[in-house]
């Protein structure tokens, strides 16, 4: 079982992560989202408020959990995100893969609305920088996270 560091950008310290059902679903449905990319978490924290915080967690995988992993943007990834953003609730404990960031999200929404084709979507996103997200969708999954520290990114 490997131990890796994950980051969560927020406007508050999150010692005890929770899964919250909100008005809008995210790429992989409702869950607690982290990334293995510190700079990405920093951007999430910085844009959320004047008091941005990057929370740092150690993550130890659990082979008993149901995990879905997308190594890159694929048709399956696109279809899964489309379903989740439309309200689909899956039974995975953890989902990991690329993130539909703000730019990609606009292309995704145009694809879902039928304004562009699947081929056009892939053409538009193929040169975008890599992103990463890992989302936790059950209490068993959240038990894989251990809060290490938080860092304020702006004052």
Where are these regions (language model features)?
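Conserved NAD+-utilizing ADP-ribose enzyme module
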Residues: 2, 14, 26-27, 47-155
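Structured mid-domain segments that build the active-site/substrate or prosthetic-cofactor binding neighborhood
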Residues: 5
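Hydrophobic transmembrane alpha-helices
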Residues: 9-27
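Extended catalytic/binding region for NAD+/ADP-ribose chemistry, centered on the ART fold
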Residues: 23-48
């Amino acid at each position: 079982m490997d131990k890796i560091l994950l980051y969560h950008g927020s406007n508050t310290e999150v010692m005890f992560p929770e899964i919250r059902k909100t008005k809008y679903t995210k790429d992989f449905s409702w869950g607690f989202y982290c990334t293995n990319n510190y700079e990405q978490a920093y951007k999430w924290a910085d844009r959320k408020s004047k008091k941005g915080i990057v929370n740092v967690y150690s993550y130890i995988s659990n082979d008993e959990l149901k995990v879905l992993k997308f190594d890159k943007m694929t048709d399956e990834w696109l279809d899964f995100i489309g379903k989740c953003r439309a309200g689909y609730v899956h039974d995975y404990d953890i989902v990991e893969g690329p993130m539909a960031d703000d730019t990609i999200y606009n292309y995704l929404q145009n694809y879902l609305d039928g304004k562009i084709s699947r081929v056009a979507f892939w053409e538009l996103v193929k040169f975008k920088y890599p992103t990463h997200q890992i989302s936790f969708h059950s209490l068993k999954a959240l038990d894989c996270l251990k809060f290490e520290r938080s860092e304020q990114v702006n004052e």
